[in-house]
Amino acid sequence: MEVPAGNILDAEGRGVRVLMSGLDYERVVLSGIGTGIMAACLDEIMPYMVARKQFGQSIGRFQLMQAKIADIYTRLNSARSYVYEVARACDRGQITRADAAACVLYSSEAAMLVAHQAVQAMGGTGFMNDTPVSRIFRDAKLMEIGAGTSEIRRMLIGRELLEAMPA
């Protein structure tokens, strides 16, 4: 296919480089989706923890459920802090491919762990297809496989870190 000269980005034959140059920023943007998934999980399970009664009390009073809440809260805030820090590096023009990939890797895997815990916390209700937590769980899985799998992200991070080592 012939591309008019006025539509060519960068130099001829370097289109892949132009395309790849935006991937680091895309990875940071996608990382924000992971934090949104985790926040949605917390928003869904908190009212459930209060409303659902077992043995005459809210299940949120059980230590194991409190531990789930604590783990979700901690992962959410850890991922959010990392995403914000890498986003600030983007704003300063100091983004690294390893940080962008690590950010989306951590955020997506944390989102999957959190979504799994949200389903667990809600039991059978959380697994039903018509509940938000079930949809969130499926969305979280997509974060691990869409726009590059976790395995590809790990390979990229390892390669970037090794290439940065002095010879």
Task: Annotate each language-model stretch with its function.
Residues 1-17:
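Long, acidic (Asp/Glu-rich), low-complexity accessory segments flanking structured domains
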Residues 12-14, 18-167:
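Alpha-helical interface subdomain recognition
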